[in-house]
């Protein structure tokens, strides 16, 4: 019973800390990661369909690299 209460309090505390940190850092991020394929396709660093690619580099505009070519 005590352990359950301690775990619940710890989870609530960690959640509150994350929310506070996220609220404080809003708009201050300088190098934002490309998170969607729409943003990735507008980037000049991505490769078009049929171009050679590497699965490790994530450099296709479509977001998928199969058999060494962007899909």
From Swiss-Prot:
Pfam families: Conotoxin (PF02950). Keywords: Amidation, Calcium channel impairing toxin, Disulfide bond, Ion channel impairing toxin, Knottin, Neurotoxin, Pharmaceutical, Presynaptic neurotoxin, Secreted, Signal, Toxin, Voltage-gated calcium channel impairing toxin. It comes from the Eukaryota. Changing residue 59 to N: In omega-3; 2.8-fold increase in inhibition of Cav2.2/CACNA1B and decrease in efficacy to kill goldfish (LD(50) is 0.20 mg/kg by intramuscular injection). GO terms for molecular function: calcium channel regulator activity; ion channel inhibitor activity; toxin activity. The modification Cysteine amide is found at residue 70. The presence of a 'disulfide through disulfide knot' structurally defines this protein as a knottin. This is Omega-conotoxin MVIIA. It comes from Conus magus (Magical cone). The lineage of its organism: Eukaryota, Metazoa, Spiralia, Lophotrochozoa, Mollusca.
């Amino acid at each position: 019973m005590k352990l359950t209460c301690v775990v619940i309090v710890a989870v609530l505390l960690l959640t509150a800390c994350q929310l506070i940190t996220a609220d404080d850092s809003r708009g201050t991020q300088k190098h934002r990661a490309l998170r969607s394929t729409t943003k990735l396709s507008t980037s000049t660093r991505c490769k078009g369909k049929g171009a050679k690619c590497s699965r490790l580099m994530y450099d296709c505009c479509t977001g998928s690299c199969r058999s060494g070519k962007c899909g």
